[in-house]
Amino acid sequence: MEKYNNWKLKFYTIWAGQAVSLITSAILQMAIIFYLTEKTGSAMVLSMASLLGFLPYAVFGPAIGVLVDRHDRKKIMIGADLIIAAAGSVLTIVAFYMELPVWMVMIVLFIRSIGTAFHTPALNAVTPLLVPEEQLTKCAGYSQSLQSISYIVSPAVAALLYSVWELNAIIAIDVLGAVIASITVAIVRIPKLGDRVQSLDPNFIREMQEGMAVLRQNKGLFALLLVGTLYMFVYMPINALFPLISMDYFNGTPVHISITEISFASGMLIGGLLLGLFGNYQKRILLITASIFMMGISLTISGLLPQSGFFIFVVCCAIMGLSVPFYSGVQTALFQEKIKPEYLGRVFSLTGSIMSLAMPIGLILSALFADRIGVNHWFLLSGTLIICIAIVCPMINEIRKLDLK
């Protein structure tokens, strides 16, 4: 237990740096959307920007996981933050001399996404080296709260800053945030995994396969991953349809869209705080199942509402947000607890890659059918499918056994 001495100081030091970086990155992300919308007015350009945001994780995730497990995760986290900072610095310098070309913004978005693809699994793999097992779920809850704060703050702050500053000034703030995050990681002593690096298989492909093999050996986690992939496949396209249902079905305005987004993020914040405060609850599969069920019920009710039911829809959005930490946070803690630390980089990169690949497939299907059957009916159909997933999840014996020590 010696490695957990002063774990709170270590975790919250890193957490504070990540808080600054996450919020500044979210602000910049929104500002870039404003910039691309203003300069091009093209839905294709915005779709490309979104695609570049998750493409590296989806395509290169398994290979990145091998590198995270082979090398010092602390150095990887610092390096990823500095790469993000360097990419932003290039944009800042160029913007002083000329108007930023769209192609350059796209390249920087891609580079930032690569940095995130390294940073996220490294951070998830480092956490169980710092935090006692019984505290992992609570820490995941606090991390979810931080993410929701960035969702709430970033649109308003980005809109304010973009109205008074040039884009390069906002980029400079994000560069500073990345530097602060790298400094907080640098000053924390993170336990090492001994001679792990020297003992790794020199065959890169075989190491990637080991990530899947480790998952398949734990039948409960593998089954949970499959359930989660199906859940993301159904749920993620709904994220893109909130503006559509707010304006087209409920006859709202951009203000109504903002209200639904703030409601969702506020619910997510409350859910993360509740998970952080009461994260020692042992029946975690029950929490995951309840989370999925809450999402399904909220979507189903949203799809059944009349066009005058916007207020109830806002309440449903808050419940959806409330449910999110009890799925993603608890699932992350389960993986951190059940997988050996030397494999966590590969496992988290692999799971992130699978989830990322499920997103575009679901988006394509929703784009094909939502307009044909009506966006409200798509919410109803998605909610019904998610309720079915919630019913099936605890019926799988291997998943139920995950709560057993």
Curated annotation (Swiss-Prot):
It is found in: Cell membrane. The keyword Cell membrane applies. Gene3D superfamilies: MFS general substrate transporter like domains. Pfam families: MFS_3. This is Macrolide efflux protein A. Keywords: Antibiotic resistance, Cell membrane, Membrane, Transmembrane, Transmembrane helix, Transport. Belongs to the major facilitator superfamily. Drug:H(+) antiporter-3 (DHA3) (TC 2.A.1.21) family. It is a multi-pass membrane protein. InterPro entries: Drug_antiport, MFS_dom, MFS_trans_sf, TM_effector. Its main location: membrane. The keyword Transmembrane helix applies. One of its GO terms (biological process) is response to antibiotic. It comes from the Bacteria. Confers resistance to 14-membered macrolides including erythromycin and to 15-membered macrolides but not to 16-membered macrolides, lincosamides or analogs of streptogramin B. May function as an efflux pump to regulate intracellular macrolide levels. It comes from Streptococcus pyogenes. The chain crosses the membrane at residues 14-34, 48-68, 76-98, 145-165, 168-188, 222-242, 259-279, 285-305, 310-330, 350-370, 373-393. Signal peptide: none annotated. One of its GO terms (molecular function) is transmembrane transporter activity. NCBIfam families: 2A0121, macrolide_MefA. GO terms for cellular component: plasma membrane. SUPFAM superfamilies: MFS general substrate transporter (SSF103473).
